[in-house]
Amino acid sequence: DGQHWQAKLVRSLKVPSQPESCVADDDNGTLYLGEEDEAIWRFAAEPDAATTGEVLVKADGKALVADIEGLALIKHQGRTMVLVSSQGNDSYLIYDTKAPYQQLLHFRVTTNPELGIDGSSETDGLDLTQGSLGVGFSQGALVVQDGRNRMPETGQNLKLIPLEHILQLLPKTH
């Protein structure tokens, strides 16, 4: 009737320490899981699949710096990529989801003094859509949580970034 639903636990997944975020790729039957201080993991998403995962990429303390927080998927030019927030250095990385899991992009959301908008920092979560949101966001948007709002000096907020700005920075596929 649309008012009631039930769920049944079909399996449990585990990583060595604290899981922080996850995103599912329905097209490829894969679940990506961020382990806060350590790595991004890849698991088969089917209910009867194994419960062991594979490390996609480890936090290296240089580009990907703990805490590993939000995860989202980007599908572009026939490629599926995972976007991750690297809280320890206030940045974002995009990795190919196919081995050898190459880092494709590393970027920051920086201050725009002309518009009075500060950059993002201490991101705990993010998400994106690749559907058009109208003028300025025709290819979608990335939304990131900003833990320290500096312009003006107030509580945390969200930053909305046109996805086409990020897609333009990605290396072209061959």
Regions of interest found by a model, annotated:
Residues 1-174:
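Sequence/structural signature of beta-propeller domains
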